[in-house]
Amino acid sequence: MSRGLGDVYKRQVITGLTVVLPNGDIINTGSRTKKTSAGYNLTNLFIGSEGTLGIITEVQLRLSPIPESIMAAVCHFPTLEKAVQTAQQVIQYGVPIARIEMLNKDQMGISINYSKLKDVEAVPTLFFEFHGSEQSNNENIKVVEEISKENSGSSFKWAKDLEDRNKLWKARWDVYYSVKALINNGRVYSTDVCLPISNITECVNYAEEQAKKFGLRAPMVGHLGDGNFLSLIHI
């Protein structure tokens, strides 16, 4: 189970492709079998090429069942280091979790103002999502809450109903639009960096320093499950 955005990574759910090559030839990649040793792994090659090796016209996907229960939680932290450390420990302890998202202090403040959020602090914040049975989700939430508290986490809240889950994640869902609303005729450019989660804190701190150095405002959102974070730069 992915700890980034969704149940599994894209490469894991794509089983085959139909691709039009530059010379006009049409090829099919992949296999219906779970394993194959016949030839090169062209499916992953074309996924990683981002359209430079051929135009993908059809995609074969492996479907997953809808989880019996989906729950969400949020937790505030005094520092970015504490938030990242919590995510690291949740993953290291093998807690089954579908998503771990992070907003830095600046982005939380922007989201709070834009979405008129109450009882939410402008501090580094983690957003969790759990998939599974209701019993397993309840157990995993307790584990994550305990890990969060050990890392100085506060205001831990969780919900299971869709409306309540959306309220908890409101600051996360409105990231792009909240940043866009800060500028009139300018644009928002998104960077996309992926690195070992142990290096996230150092990299984010450096990115924040560079943004200040050049007079830019660049709030950040992180997909900590896969060590990915984005800076939303105002131009």
Report residues per predicted region:
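Single conserved hydrophobic/aromatic residue that forms the stacking wall/gate
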Residues: 1-5, 9, 233-234
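Structural signature of FAD isoalloxazine-binding scaffolds in flavoprotein oxidoreductases
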Residues: 6-23, 55-58, 123
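Short beta-strand-to-turn element immediately C-terminal to the catalytic PLP-Schiff-base lysine
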Residues: 20, 47-48, 56-58, 62, ...
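Flexible, small-/acidic-enriched active-site or ligand-binding loops
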Residues: 35-37
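Residue-level structural signal for beta-strand termini and adjacent loop
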Residues: 31-32, 59
